[in-house]
Each structure stands twice: as C-alpha cells, then as structure tokens.
C-alpha cells in the first residue's frame, strides 16, 4: 500500500515537524511518522480523534492558521480534493516548507512527480516556489 512507501520517503528525506493536511480517517502515515520520532501535526476541517503521538487541529487550509504550519519541514496531504491543491501549496510556500501531495488516481497538478517504491506523488521543494 502506498502509505508505507510515503512514510518511508518522508522519514528518509525530512526531519522534525511535519503537517498532514486533511487527515480524515486514514491516520497510518501520521502514526508511523510519530513512531519514528517526528513531531506530527494533523489538520482537518472537522474534529477528529488525534492519531497516537500526533497533535490535531481543526483548520481550513483555504483560510489557514499559519501558526500550525510554521516550522514544518514538510506539509503533506493524502488524496485531497483537487480544489485544495493550490491552497496546500500556498500554505507550504508561506511557511517555507516542502509540499507533498498524493492525489487520487487521475487527479493532476503542475508539479514534479516522484515515483518512490511504486508510490507516485507530487513534490514541490521550497526552493522551487515562485
């Protein structure tokens, strides 16, 4: 399943604080990263159970509380709706974090595609923001 590969990719390439946008009910990546020593923040527009080892915040990425995201090395989202892609990238740009988006099959955005151990996702590095 792609979630393990994405957790491995993040663990191999990032340190410290990471933020998952729109965590929903699929908390495996956040929980795996927390177990690996990451400071994991998770957000959603509705109240959710905080994944083990994570901090949860109700936040709307289209009207974000930037304090939640500040200091993150990576902001990532797993299968967000395409209408949120630009908001996720914009929050990442504003706080100087890399941005990783794993879209639903067939969703497209203008960004570099990474194929890591069979998991495909978009990655925008902080140095590539306009």
UniProtKB/Swiss-Prot annotation:
Disulfide bonds: none annotated. Coiled coil: none annotated. Belongs to the UPF0146 family. Pfam families: UPF0146. This is UPF0146 protein AF_0739.1. Signal peptide: none annotated. It comes from the Archaea.
């Amino acid at each position: 399943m792609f979630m393990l590969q994405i957790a491995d990719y993040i663990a191999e390439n990032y340190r410290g604080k990471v933020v998952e946008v729109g965590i929903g009910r699929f908390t495996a990546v956040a929980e795996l990263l927390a177990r690996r020593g990451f400071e994991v923040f998770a957000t959603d527009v509705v109240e959710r159970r905080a994944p083990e080892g994570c901090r949860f915040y109700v936040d709307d990425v289209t009207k974000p509380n930037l304090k939640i995201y500040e200091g993150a090395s990576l902001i990532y989202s797993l299968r967000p709706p395409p209408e949120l892609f630009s908001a996720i990238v914009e929050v990442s740009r504003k706080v100087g974090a890399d941005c990783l988006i794993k879209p639903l099959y067939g969703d497209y955005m203008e960004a570099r595609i990474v194929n890591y151990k069979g998991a495909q996702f978009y990655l925008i590095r902080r140095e590539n923001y306009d």
